A protein has these predicted regions:
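Conserved acidic segment of CheY-like receiver
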Residues: 13-27, 32-36, 49, 64-65, ...
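Acidic, metal-coordinating helix/loop segments flanking the phosphotransfer/catalytic sites
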Residues: 45-63
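Acidic catalytic/metal-coordinating carboxylates
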Residues: 47-48, 74-78
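Active-site residues of response regulator receiver
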Residues: 67, 95
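Receiver (REC) domain active-site loop signature in two-component systems and cognate sites
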Residues: 70
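C-terminal output helix
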Residues: 99, 115, 119-128, 174
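Basic, Lys/Arg-enriched C-terminal extension of HTH/homeodomain DNA-binding domains
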Residues: 191-215
Length: 215
């Protein structure tokens, strides 16, 4: 198992694709490690989910593969704990004993895949590829949201007020009525907001709103 120091060092690599394997069965854990390491994934293996939860890993393209039934914690409980911490990393569940109810619960909470033991090498790889792709999309969206937040900080107090009204779909006359500004000043603030936020249309501005809602 990697140490925290090694884990953080590896996570900082922009090209590394990480797989966190939580499996109490030594043989299964080893098999998954071997398969994925041969494909150049950075694999972090844990026998106990509490060991996994104890690490402080950085944001990176990653996917979690976890057994559904373990002595100290179920896969559902691990998933819930990650969500509570704001860690929305894609999760692949593996199990040979889980009920249909557990599988449905996992998928309802956002699980990526549910593999029933014994699963094929191909199914495992497909699930990991899918998970990494999904996490890369999440990180890209997060980066865009952070950029939008930085752009918002460049707005003056008055410009920010106009920005919030534009988000609500206010037209020029409605902005004038809501703020008491003259029509000329309202249009001027609107132009500055569009320029600073790097958009050319109200539709683009509304897309920025969606990014902010997902932050």
């Amino acid at each position: 198992m990697s140490t925290n120091k090694a884990l953080n060092s590896q996570t900082q690599s922009s090209k590394a694709e990480h797989v966190f394997v939580i499996e109490d069965d030594d043989g299964m854990r080893h098999t998954i490690q071997v398969i994925l390491k041969l494909l150049d994934y950075v694999v972090h293996a844990f026998k106990d989910p509490n060991e996994f939860l104890a690490i402080d890993f950085l944001e990176a393209p990653a996917v979690v593969i976890t057994d559904m039934k373990m002595p100290s914690m179920t896969g559902i409980e691990l998933q819930a704990e990650l969500l509570a911490r704001g860690q929305n990393i894609p999760i692949v569940f593996v199990s040979g004993q889980s009920s249909l109810e557990q599988g449905l619960m996992a998928m309802k909470q956002g699980a990526l895949e549910f593999l029933v033991k014994p699963f094929s090498r191909e199914d495992l790889i497909k699930a990991v590829v899918k998970g990494i792709a999904k996490d890369m999309e999440r990180l890209q969206a997060l980066n865009r949201s952070e950029k939008v937040a930085l752009l918002l900080k460049t707005l003056t107090k008055s410009e920010l007020e106009v920005f919030k009204l534009l988000e609500k779909g206010f037209n020029n006359q409605e902005i004038v009525q809501a703020t008491g500004l003259t029509l000329y000043t309202a249009k001027n603030y609107k132009a500055k907001v569009m320029q600073k936020m790097g958009v050319k249309s109200l539709a683009e501005l509304l897309r920025l709103k969606e990014l902010l809602l997902n932050m």
